[in-house]
Amino acid sequence: YFPKFFHPDPSVKRQSGFLKPEINNSNILGSSFTLPYFKTISHNKDLTITPTWFDSDTLMSSFEYRKVEKNSKLITDIGYVSGYKSSSTKKKKNISHLFLNYNLDLNLENYISSDLEFSLERVSNDTYLKVFDPHITKSILRPKNFDNLNNSFKIFLNHNDFNFESGFKSFENLQISKGSDRYQYILPYYNFDKNIDQDYFGGKINFNSNGNNDLSSTNDLKSSVVNNLTYNSLDYVSNFGLKNNFNFVFQNLNSI
């Protein structure tokens, strides 16, 4: 008996089942066989279990969990590799990764939208992502750069009168060996936009302010605040049919 395969997609009813298996070959890892299994937990929760067997006696297990609520969405991907032997050390070890993305609608009163976002990227080995590239998740959690990991906590507020974004970010450069120097922290940062006047002498006046504290290379701290006051004229058409406009920008820069 061989289990029936299901391929979940929006056009079919959600149901548990095996997904399409894969066979791969790598100069580093050798041949491998992957057999994903999709598990429906409830109407708003599901899990994809993805074991991969390598002919080098290495086993990789990945678990991607998804949960959607009325005002929130969570997706996590956890991977664990047992029995991996590095070509440099020739010793077997266990390595892992954790990726996470969480979105929450704060539903604040008097705001068009108010959202919170948290994302996390962690690995236990600097070359893990490159070595196991074909077996790393293809979802939105997949790191965009295998040399740099990004982590962030952000808040977005959209109001009729202004837009505001703030939070913190951290970056880890996997190519730098010194532990403290490989990290960069933006803590905090902000960006504020406000339309002051929509009809001022035939144009619009907008105010923008943004700033951050940037800590890198262990103790290199830089702080900056930039304020911009912008005037944008409305378009006007000349007698020759040419459309024209102009703008002025007044900028105040403060940095340490």
Kindly label every feature range from the protein language model:
Residues 1-256:
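Outer-membrane beta-barrel proteins and related beta-barrel translocases across Gram-negative bacteria
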